């Protein structure tokens, strides 16, 4: 019998969301994504400590920032040995409001990959979907450096990313779901408010429809899933990046997966494009409490994990 994972792959490019690259082979994803939290989690496992220790040993006299960049490339390089497609490597979240330094970091990471013999067509540079991050992506894209816009929670962010020519966006399904569920409290009803009505699922569906309606080439990759239901409700989305735990659940399931999103069957098409000059962007983002709070929280969490990784590296010198 065909597994739910195999059925999903008929409609959507499946991406593995992990730094634990030893798990990749069993799920055969096309691409992989990493972030500071996933790398921090991976290097604390016995299987990956040798990569961390070797990177620190080889560059002991260099700055911690220098070592972290090499560690990211070491993980990305190993991941690319196991997948046919692309890996996403994230720019330090502490640069989320600094366009020039985000551009410099993106260029630097690509140079390191190319020095390791990996072409830029296999790399996506992850940037936070702040106004400053989007402007950095606009510059990098024109240089042939493809960008994955992360921490995306709203249509205005998605619209701005598309106008900037970003290669790909990662709307965060699960974190949107978390916010609305917390706000609802005891009134939340999973049967009524989940599934196709899940606010995270609806957000991605709205963004997907917007992009296809207006002919944007930016890829939509749903991310940050809590349940397999959220994933299967988005079957047909350009890409979905999924944690190993949920990939395993899909592989263990024989439930029928049907296509839910298609450029040929768009529903509730928008009438007009979103206004996305800087003032309009900032106002619309500010007007969306969920997106504002989750973007700020996401940057804080990734920045905190970057600091933890720095401390771990410094302890090994």
Curated annotation (Swiss-Prot):
It is found in: Cytoplasm. Its EC number is 2.2.1.2. The keyword Cytoplasm applies. The active site is at residue 126. Keywords: Cytoplasm, Pentose shunt, Schiff base, Transferase. InterPro entries: Aldolase_TIM (IPR013785), TAL/FSA (IPR001585), Transaldolase_1 (IPR004730), Transaldolase_AS (IPR018225). The keyword Thylakoid does not apply. One of its GO terms (molecular function) is transaldolase activity. SUPFAM superfamilies: Aldolase (SSF51569). Transaldolase is important for the balance of metabolites in the pentose-phosphate pathway. Homodimer. PANTHER family: TRANSALDOLASE (PTHR10683:SF18). This is Transaldolase. It comes from Burkholderia lata (strain ATCC 17760 / DSM 23089 / LMG 22485 / NCIMB 9086 / R18194 / 383). The gene is tal.
